Design a protein with these regions (language model features):
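Short, small-residue-biased leader/transition segments that mark boundaries at the very start
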Residues: 1-4
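Long amphipathic alpha-helical segments with strong coiled-coil/leucine-zipper propensity
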Residues: 58-147
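Amphipathic alpha-helical packing elements
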Residues: 140-181
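Serine-biased, low-complexity intrinsically disordered segments, primarily in secretory-pathway proteins
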Residues: 253-257
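N-terminal interaction modules that seed assembly of large macromolecular complexes
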Residues: 43-63
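Accessory, usually C-terminal, subdomains that scaffold auxiliary metal cofactors
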Residues: 179-252
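Acidic carboxylate diad motif detector
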Residues: 13-19
Length: 258
């Protein structure tokens, strides 16, 4: 269990926290955390009545985060956390989406209609939804659905004591770089995230905007709120992602087999 608390001097001029906080803001907010606080909660303080999921009243934050990592992700150690983040930054649910999109886009008009005719109730709306999202996002797919969750993983990992603050930020760097290189604003990135979430959850979005969903409304609320609007600074997309001096996701991964 790491005991190093947030030290700005420990990460030099890195701006990775400025990427991490908005990337993880929705789940931080939904789980009664503070979107401005890296790790969701202040270590040592009980998680106050979130009423959702594994986050329970009077549960020490590190226990809540460890249970979430274990129950939802099968992560029970530092090694598993680092391996999962490094892997999913490159190959997450977007791989499954692209595979499905490739299948449906490769069909003739008659083949597509035959697929719909043979599909069950859910697939009858998921195939058109997959096709529409593929046309909308192209090669980007549902990338932000994967990248944003990496922010939550490293923050939970920090809070759980599996990573130090500098290590958590360094582990997120590849995801932040991919985000910056692929999108140009938080609205665009969050629309992609929301599309990805609804695709993964197999929600029927026929005739509905992602901004009308509970998560879409949550993002708009965070962005419009005076308390949290500054998190979503589009100027970040015009700046370089500044790494943590002397640390990287690659070095953390390599150290596991050293």
């Amino acid at each position: 269990y790491t005991t190093l608390f947030r030290s700005k001097t420990a990460v030099g001029d890195s701006n990775l926290e400025a990427w991490a906080l908005p990337m993880g803001a929705i789940l931080s907010s939904l789980n009664a955390g503070d979107p401005y606080w890296f790790g969701l909660y202040s270590r040592g303080l009980p998680v106050a009545g979130s009423g959702s999921g594994a986050y329970t009243t009077n549960d020490p934050p590190y226990k809540s985060c460890r249970r979430t990592l274990s129950d939802d992700w099968g992560i029970d150690s530092r090694e598993a956390l680092i391996t999962t983040v490094c892997s999913m930054t490159l190959h997450g649910h977007n791989d499954s989406f692209q595979e499905a999109a490739g299948l449906v886009n490769g069909l003739s008009a008659s083949g597509y209609q035959e697929l719909l005719n043979e599909s069950g109730e859910v697939d009858r709306y998921m195939w058109p939804q997959t096709k529409a999202l593929s046309e909308k996002w192209g090669d980007r797919g549902i990338l932000c659905w994967d990248l944003f969750r990496m922010s939550n993983l490293v923050q939970w990992g920090y809070e759980a004591g599996y990573l130090t603050y500098p290590e958590a930020l360094a582990l997120l760097e590849p995801a932040a770089v991919r985000l910056k290189e692929t999108f140009s604003s938080w609205d665009e990135a969050y629309e992609n995230y929301l599309d990805g979430y609804n695709w993964w959850a197999r929600n029927d979005m026929t005739g509905q905007s992602v901004w009308e969903t509970s998560r879409g409304k949550r993002y708009l609320l965070l962005k419009e709120s005076e308390a949290t609007s500054a998190l979503f600074d589009d100027a970040l997309f015009s700046c370089a992602v500044l790494p943590v001096p002397g640390l990287s996701a690659a070095s953390l991964s390599a150290a596991l087999s050293a």
